[in-house]
Amino acid sequence: MTEQRPLTIALVAGETSGDILGAGLIRALKERVPNARFVGVAGPRMQAEGCEAWYEMEELAVMGIVEVLGRLRRLLHIRADLTKRFGELKPDVFVGIDAPDFNITLEGNLKKQGIKTIHYVSPSVWAWRQKRVFKIGRATDLVLAFLPFEKAFYDKYNVPCRFIGHTMADAMPLDPDKNAARDVLGIPHDAHCLALLPGSRGAEVEMLSADFLKTAQLLRQTYPDLEIVVPLVNAKRREQFERIKAEVAPDLSVHLLDGMGREAMVASDAALLASGTAALECMLAKCPMVVGYRMKPFTFWLAKRLVKTEYVSLPNLLAGRELVKELLQEECEPQKLAAALLPLLANGKTSHAMHDTFRELHQQIRCNADEQAAQAVLELAQ
């Protein structure tokens, strides 16, 4: 920071989740340093907080190998241009928000020019391709991690890392209002309720929906009043799910929801879901769950050799034990899924114990992440 100019922070966000994090960070920094300047690659939320966008975030938001290859020349041009322009600007700190394939190389380029760099949101290096930790260590002055076990991993390799808590844990109440969520969804307060979340990607919905629906049919035999809610992330996934349901369980009555995943979790006595961020959100919603996941045999074979963790779901990784049942590949079949869900729908000891542990884990990662991230940026800027 120099006296001639305000605190200058450069940021690059590559997708909507990064734009939300970036906006929260900018807001927290502006409260401390009102005249700070923010520049870089920003989405609408970051721009609304006052970030100058040298490039729109959509330029980086490409998914899949084919799409990335098609845009590779443009992506490389943007990264080279940012390296040059940030090098000339000499910001007090550069913050790369997620988008590791783009940002970590950029961070390394800038660090070589004497610019302090932060990588915000750890890639899953603790789970697979662990050698990436060495590249991250060379490229960044600090990693900001959402989860405590991520910091423990970086500590092993002497890479500076700060656990800041999870923004989702900050955003969700410790004690959600189940009846209020049921009122929103039109679910009777006294009914048993199951949420089915077969994933956000097309391949997941294709692989999991049939077994999830058959599981719900089995559970209806025990709980005839069972209300089934199925939140789907967009119209495409909804069409896909409806097609599969018409083939597998045409007579099964369900509530199809456009989005509203969080409301569905809060309203439900139990959830059956694919792994991923949904499992963390379900934990924070205090909804007992079973994780069911299947992928193509070769992909699973490869994953077993690459993935270094004992569990796949974040609640189990946070707890350090099998807190929630994980049924993968051939284990992910209706009889076993239903058997794991039955004690949760009973609302007895099993689900109460799970609920209490979920609450403890929520408190552990509820640390006001925006404020913690802002503090880390300012300390590095000194």
Curated annotation (Swiss-Prot):
EC number(s) reported in the record: 2.4.1.182
Entry-linked CDD domains: Glycosyltransferase_GTB-type
Function: Condensation of UDP-2,3-diacylglucosamine and 2,3-diacylglucosamine-1-phosphate to form lipid A disaccharide, a precursor of lipid A, a phosphorylated glycolipid that anchors the lipopolysaccharide to the outer membrane of the cell.
Catalysed reaction equations from the record: 2-N,3-O-bis[(3R)-3-hydroxytetradecanoyl]-alpha-D-glucosaminyl 1-phosphate + UDP-2-N,3-O-bis[(3R)-3-hydroxytetradecanoyl]-alpha-D-glucosamine = lipid A disaccharide (E. coli) + UDP + H(+); a lipid X + a UDP-2-N,3-O-bis[(3R)-3-hydroxyacyl]-alpha-D-glucosamine = a lipid A disaccharide + UDP + H(+)
Superkingdom: Bacteria
CC annotations in GO: membrane
UniProt gene name: lpxB
Molecular-function GO term, any one: phospholipid binding
Entry's Gene Ontology BP terms: lipid A biosynthetic process
Pathway: Glycolipid biosynthesis; lipid IV(A) biosynthesis; lipid IV(A) from (3R)-3-hydroxytetradecanoyl-[acyl-carrier-protein] and UDP-N-acetyl-alpha-D-glucosamine: step 5/6
Keywords: Glycosyltransferase, Lipid A biosynthesis, Lipid biosynthesis, Lipid metabolism, Transferase
Enzymatic class: transferase
Family statement: Belongs to the LpxB family.
Protein name: Lipid-A-disaccharide synthase
Pfam family, any one: LpxB
